[in-house]
């Protein structure tokens, strides 16, 4: 498992946010971040846009 930073943009309130996630690959990291957005905010890709996924080098 690797550590990733997933950057998201809220298209309604116009702000950026970043999620640190542990995942197998960048696609999995994106999916984990989207699920966290849904769990934490009640919104997913209807309000947020994933803008970048970057692996964190240890």
Regions found by a protein language model. Give the residues of each.
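Short, mixed-charge low-complexity intrinsically disordered segments
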Residues: 35-58
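Generic structural signal for short, flexible, solvent-exposed coil/loop and linker residues
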Residues: 8-12, 26, 39
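Short aromatic-glycine-(Arg/Gly/Cys) micro-motifs in beta-strand/loop hairpins
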Residues: 1-17
